[in-house]
Amino acid sequence: MIIIGEKLNGSIPSVAKAIADKDAELIKERARKQAEAGATFLDVCASVEEDVEVETLKWMIDLVQEVTDTPICVDSPSAKSCVAAIPFCKRPGLVNSVSLEGDKIDRIFPVIADTDWECVALLCDNDGIPDSVERRMKVFHGIMEKAKEYGIAPSRLHIDPLVVTLSTDETALTVFACLLYTSPSPRDR
């Protein structure tokens, strides 16, 4: 199991304030604490306007790398920002995320293909989160085909099945159980 520290996200009010105020100490402290707690990757998500996102990601990534060697998880809804942030990282990390929605997978996979970068893959497409096991498996296989096309080993992908909560969808548990049952073990890939 991998643990992704998610406390360096501009959608968190205290982090948003630190970004706006250029409070380097808060960013460093959050990075240090998550690394000490055993995070495998530290997710860095600026959650700012796209015209300043890349420079904000660079600032945050540089601060994180001053205090820890824990690999970075580059996180943005923008493929352009993710791709631009990869060179700021001192070592390969994780891109969060691709799916079959839009063209993000075709913009990120070529960049990480010949590297040791890993990637979170969300099981959704242009129709949203699949509501059946069959549709989720179709999306899963589509992502795996794209990975194969770009020469990305399955072991470099971390599949997020996007399980919806039981409080919003009573079939959620059944869908997740079926996904687990029908998915090949990583050892079998």
Stretch-by-stretch model annotation:
Residues 39-68, 164-168:
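Glycine-rich, proline-tolerant flexible connector loops at the mouths of alpha/beta enzymes
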Residues 51-59, 77-82, 101-111, 174:
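Active-site-adjacent beta->alpha loops and helix N-cap segments on the catalytic face
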Residues 30-42:
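Catalytic domains of carbohydrate-active enzymes, especially glycoside hydrolases
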Residues 102-168:
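Conserved anion-binding
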Residues 45-47, 71-77, 93-101:
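Catalytic beta/alpha-barrel core
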Residues 181-188:
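Conserved small/polar residues in nucleotide/adenosyl-binding loops
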Residues 34, 85, 159:
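Conserved, mostly hydrophobic/aromatic
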